[in-house]
């Protein structure tokens, strides 16, 4: 963390070690009970934003004439150690992902800022938990549209000299082709997926090239109008399921956790409503009674702040350490 902060030019203003926290109490049966905190590091980043209207989100645009570009910050490494795939398959001992060259992250940040200033980007999402497959799915869920992934550039056999080179070598049989597909889909190495129009694609790739990221950048997909999540490789469709099916499965983990914490009947109703809403275009709606509407109309307008600023209180949840910045800005 210290090395990254120095190379990236950022600081950690405050922090606390919650990874070693434990709760101890005596149970009803008289036995001593101890629960340790989950060994999961959570880091909250904050920075001033001059114009929130230019913020990028993972919400993919359903426009068909667009492309998805993966910027891979580890030069093709696909380490699976500690990944979701490794956990569910019981695969231990693999090297874990790492940011081997922090300067690539700096270059990516500079390139993204320039691209956004030129209006080249429609959506942005990082590759993290679940790998590229989860990243693409989450973008599709946010935009309520399908996505087709093309993995040819991510599964190139390093031992094949050309497309017609079928000589059998010992090193060629050390890893099955489907293993390369799984590595490409589920490695959790640092990287991002950008969406741009096809008209702007060459300009964006040129900008990435100018920042030394061309070898790390690959066109890997596009939205589709079938509302499906598809994976293609070597001219074959390896996977295809309706987006709504995958989105419901993706939301089920949160639903089960909420069922343990909240009223099960209420969470079941909310989960069912969420599933029904997945077929609708993304929108916000509110239902107000006639009484509520009239009360809103009768509400006096807030006075303009022309003199001394009013006192403002910010309610802070326990354990939240960064909201003091908002207080400083407000003063």
What are these regions (language model features)?
Residues 11, 17-188, 197-311, 318-319, ...:
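Intein/HINT protein-splicing elements and their conserved insertion hotspots or analogous self-processing inserts
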Residues 194:
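Catalytic core of tubulin tyrosine ligase-like
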Residues 1-17:
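A glycine-rich helix N-cap at a beta->alpha junction
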Residues 331:
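Conserved PLP-enzyme active-site core in the AAT-like
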